[in-house]
């Protein structure tokens, strides 16, 4: 039973009340009385509005279901369908033209282009690694991944392999020649780097000296000008550093003593309270808020054991250099942090309102993450985040402009409680629900003075695509979804609308996640598509991936690319509304079995860690043992696809159960090396995780918008109660 404290009309879990009063509030200049009184007013006023918005979602979905049911067996009439969506208020008239008015935005968001990490803030180690991923070793990223092949004696091995190391050095020199070309010759032939008369001087093998083709790319150095330890260069708005140490193991093998190239990598990171965490009660929420507090105060630390030794990981300091004129240059040492609050759907029993109801979790997150961010705003931190006095909050899973307007209202109310200037709280709008996509311009307009980010989330968006049209018929296989007409239009529409509403220079236009953290050669080949599509940020699964993805922003001048794209014909809403129905469902029995098994295995691999271990984001081996980053968004697709096929008779419930049981054995085998893992087989009936996975599919048509949170939260609480956690 949760111990509670009565605060006005609110019943607050004691663990949360104590954290807020004893840890979060001191140093903010906000009194506890002011905060709790204001919080209660916000909850009393806005919780009913939140509830009404959710009812509107259900009402629209019921109407869409009914429309399709009434036309079962008929060919889809796209024109009639569009007219129907307009009639029920799903598809709204296009908003009048406007320009975003966001002010006081940090350069990492407004004027730079580069990778973005998303990490569960519940995990302090992941949070610290991401914060520190602003700068990453190119040599390590190349040496430790499949970007450099192991052919020709270049195996990774246990010790340093010079054959592999030489390949890394050659790759890095080629990058230097591309990003910072010399006036004559090549970085490959460099024998020394020095600073003379305010310029970078590069000595070459043939005895000559040269400089940069564009001398302005050299910004500063560390150490002695004649023999610098580091040389700082800039290209396409991104910094990188040639690190020099002839006495180091790698530097000894390099003609110029270069030991590494340090890349400016994860410009921004989303500290996630949402899809990548498993937080179901007050205890869990306090873990999240406490880690966010550590990030905002700059004192988050974690004991890390590696290679037999233990050390304390902390947030990196800023990087300090000497300019050619002798003055000091300081660059931000850490990724600029967003915090992703939860959406409007879930409630959490951390607070009960005056009627004893759980309070919407999104309202709680808005209040607490903003309160905590005051430590950064007022300088009560050793590691500054925003230098422009802003707090960056990503708001996910909003359906249409009314919900965006509600977020704008919530943020205004929170600012008033905390005594913050209007529009201090900025918003990142996830374009990951169909009703937001087709009304994106109006959604941005509803928060036009706060918006700092729009981002396509292909995974959740596909889940909503399937659920919205659940009654229309059987959808295509998961692997075919990316080549459906709607998705290309969706991705282009996000860029088109973002540019048309003046986000360039004020906000990020982002793209989604590379979900295969071990396949970095493939990422390096393919993910350049995101900056080419006009995105000035895109998601990566690890600091190493951020370092490698940064290379793409040196190849593509995103802001110039956006200027080109602004001239194209905007994406068509008719294309976006094209339902991804299978032209026929005459797949072979083997194809159906493979699709069901693949989805069942992914569902179980993720759900078992969520329910049993409280892990909301992990690298889950797929059916072919390829590690895939899974979070609730991937779960939403897999469960909704199987629910759709079940609904339309492509598969039977018996097939689903049989596949889940077979795949549970596979997942148990894949997790056999984890001492804390609890096998699902053979006791399926009593295994909470297995039953949760089954429920997500069998009850998938009845889940609100296809979301997985209601089942996951209830089942995780069941598991915790059953095991005394």
Swiss-Prot record:
Binding site for Mg(2+): 432, 460
Group of enzyme by EC: transferase
Modified residues (Cysteine sulfenic acid (-SOH)): 617
Positions of glyoxylate binding: 340, 432, 457-460
Cofactor dependency: Mg(2+)
Family designation: Belongs to the malate synthase family. GlcB subfamily.
Name by which UniProt lists this protein: Malate synthase G
The organism's taxonomic lineage, starting at the top: Bacteria, Pseudomonadati, Pseudomonadota, Gammaproteobacteria, Pseudomonadales
């Amino acid at each position: 039973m949760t111990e509670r404290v009565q605060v006005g009309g609110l019943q607050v879990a004691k663990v949360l009340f104590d954290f807020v009063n004893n840890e979060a509030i001191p140093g903010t200049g906000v009194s506890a009385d002011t905060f709790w009184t204001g919080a209660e007013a916000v909850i009393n006023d806005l919780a009913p509005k939140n509830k009404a918005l959710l009812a509107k979602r259900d009402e629209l979905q019921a109407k869409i279901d009914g429309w399709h049911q009434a036309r079962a067996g008929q060919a889809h009439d796209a024109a009639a369908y569009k007219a129907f969506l307009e009639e029920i208020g799903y598809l709204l008239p296009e908003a009048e033209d406007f320009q975003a008015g966001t002010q006081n935005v940090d350069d990492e968001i407004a004027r730079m282009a580069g990778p973005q990490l998303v990490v569960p803030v519940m995990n302090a180690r992941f949070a610290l690694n991401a914060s520190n991923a602003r700068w990453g070793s190119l040599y390590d990223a190349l040496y430790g991944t499949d970007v450099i092949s192991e052919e020709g004696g270049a195996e990774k091995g246990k010790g340093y392999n010079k054959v592999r190391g030489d390949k890394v050095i050659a790759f890095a020199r080629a990058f230097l020649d591309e990003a910072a070309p010399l006036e004559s010759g090549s970085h490959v032939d460099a024998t020394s780097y020095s600073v003379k008369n305010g310029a970078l001087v590069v000595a070459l093998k043939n005895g000559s000296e040269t400089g940069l083709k564009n001398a302005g790319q050299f910004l500063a150095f560390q150490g002695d000008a004649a023999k610098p330890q580091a040389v700082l260069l800039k290209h396409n708005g991104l910094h990188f550093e040639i690190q020099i140490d002839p006495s180091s193991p790698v530097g000894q093998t390099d003609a110029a003593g270069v030991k590494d190239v340090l890349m400016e990598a994860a410009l921004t990171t989303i500290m996630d309270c949402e899809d990548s965490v498993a937080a179901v009660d007050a205890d869990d929420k306090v873990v999240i808020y406490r880690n966010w507090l550590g990030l905002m105060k700059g004192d988050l630390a974690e004991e890390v054991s590696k290679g037999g030794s233990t050390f304390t990981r902390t947030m990196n300091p800023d990087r300090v250099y000497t300019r050619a004129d002798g003055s000091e240059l300081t660059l931000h040492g850490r990724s600029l942090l967003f915090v992703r609050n939860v959406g409007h759907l879930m409630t959490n029993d951390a607070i009960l309102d005056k009627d004893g109801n759980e309070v919407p979790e999104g309202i709680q997150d808005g209040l607490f993450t903003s309160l905590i961010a005051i430590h950064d705003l007022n300088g009560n931190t050793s590691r500054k985040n925003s230098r422009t006095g802003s707090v960056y909050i990503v708001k996910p899973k909003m359906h249409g402009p009314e919900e965006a307007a509600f977020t704008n209202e919530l943020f205004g109310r929170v600012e008033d409680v905390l005594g913050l200037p209007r529009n201090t709280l900025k918003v990142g709008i996830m374009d990951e629900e169909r009703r937001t996509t087709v009304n994106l311009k109006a959604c941005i307009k509803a928060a036009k003075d706060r918006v700092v980010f729009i981002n396509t989330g292909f995974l959740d968006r596909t889940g909503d695509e399937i659920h919205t049209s659940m009654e229309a018929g059987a959808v295509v296989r998961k692997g075919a979804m990316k080549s459906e007409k709607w998705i290309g239009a969706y991705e282009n529409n996000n860029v088109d609308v973002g540019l048309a509403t003046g986000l360039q220079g004020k906000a990020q236009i982002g793209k989604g996640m590379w979900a295969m953290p071990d396949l970095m050669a493939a990422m390096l080949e393919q993910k350049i598509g995101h900056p080419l599509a006009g995105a000035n940020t895109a998601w990566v699964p690890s600091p190493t991936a951020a370092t490698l993805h940064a290379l793409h922003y040196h190849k593509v001048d995103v802001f110039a690319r956006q200027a080109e794209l602004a001239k194209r014909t905007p994406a068509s809403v008719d294309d976006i509304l094209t339902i991804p129905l299978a032209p026929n469902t005459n797949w072979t029995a083997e194809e159906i079995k493979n699709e069901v098994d693949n989805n069942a295995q992914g569902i179980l691999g993720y759900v078992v860690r969520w329910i049993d271990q409280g892990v909301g984001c992990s690298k889950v081996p797929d059916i072919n043992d390829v590690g895939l980053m899974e979070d609730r968004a991937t779960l939403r697709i897999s469960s909704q696809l199987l629910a759709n096929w079940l609904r339309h008779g492509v598969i039977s419930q018996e097939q689903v159960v049989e596949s889940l049981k077979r795949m549970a054995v596979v997942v148990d085998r894949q997790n056999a090396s984890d001492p804390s893992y609890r096998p699902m087989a053979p006791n399926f009936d009593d295994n909470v995780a297995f039953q949760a996975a089954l429920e997500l599919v069998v009850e998938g048509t009845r889940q609100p918008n296809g979301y997985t949170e209601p089942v996951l939260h209830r089942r995780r609480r069941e598991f915790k109660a059953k095991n005394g956690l």
